[in-house]
Amino acid sequence: MTTTHPSGFAPAASPLAPTMIHTPDGAISAGITSIPSQGDDMPAYYARPKASDGALPVVIVVQEIFGVHEHIRDICRRLALEGYLAIAPELYFREGDPNDFADIPTLLSGLVAKVPDSQVLADLDHVASWASRNGGDAHRLMITGFCWGGRITWLYAAHNPQLKAAVAWYGKLVGDTSLNSPKHPVDIATDLNAPVLGLYGGQDTSIPQESVETMRQALRAANAKAEIVVYPDAGHAFNADYRPGYHEASAKDGWQRMLEWFAQYGGKKG
């Protein structure tokens, strides 16, 4: 795993805010595992409830640009307390370690841009397969992702026909294409296999509201089962409780909407 920094967070995520949340793990089992994927062993963090009856609904948690650091691991723990098997794969592991980058611009150019979407989507397929062999219900597969992972969440909803529900937090919707990123969410609006909930900040300078409206129009034109919620007072990464831009009210509302979305479409065990 990349979470070797003493704080548990990638250096580029600094400065850390005092609002960070740590979920107690007394009622859950959590740890690091290795998932075979495309000839490699992919590190991943998982969390599940200690007490469970039968196979668990599965949520794949897709990292921010900072990798599977403490915030993403805590997201997994929170989902485990809600009755899910949550898995966060380390999707940069072939290309490098986020802890080797001191700031966001060099992290983006030196690592994130080198990771092909096609590789990521295939890795997520192997995560789903691993979950089905390790106590997860293959018929109740869901995904959520944040920032970089929010964009991937949209793409995966168009990639895997077995997916039941997806929730994308402030993921990029439009942009320039490249060999590693040939499509963006706006390009796959007609191909969604599962209902997608998008959660966005009205003050997000990295995702202009014009791009959110463009995505809404594409979804309407495709008659897609999707919804986009914009929080007017929130900026980018408003759920990242370890960062200064954390917006508690929006984060809490988004979390509740995510759980309701999963319960409605994902077949969560009651």
Curated annotation (Swiss-Prot):
It catalyses: 2-(5-oxo-2,5-dihydrofuran-2-ylidene)acetate + H2O = 4-oxohex-2-enedioate + H(+). Disulfide bonds: none annotated. It holds the Pfam family DLH. The keyword Hydrolase applies. Its EC number is 3.1.1.45. Belongs to the dienelactone hydrolase family. GO terms for molecular function: carboxymethylenebutenolidase activity. This is Putative carboxymethylenebutenolidase. The active site is at 147, 204, 236. The keyword DNA-binding does not apply. It is an enzyme of class 3 (hydrolase). The lineage of its organism: Bacteria, Pseudomonadati, Pseudomonadota, Gammaproteobacteria, Enterobacterales. Keywords: Hydrolase. SUPFAM superfamilies: alpha/beta-Hydrolases. It comes from the Bacteria. Gene3D superfamilies: alpha/beta hydrolase.
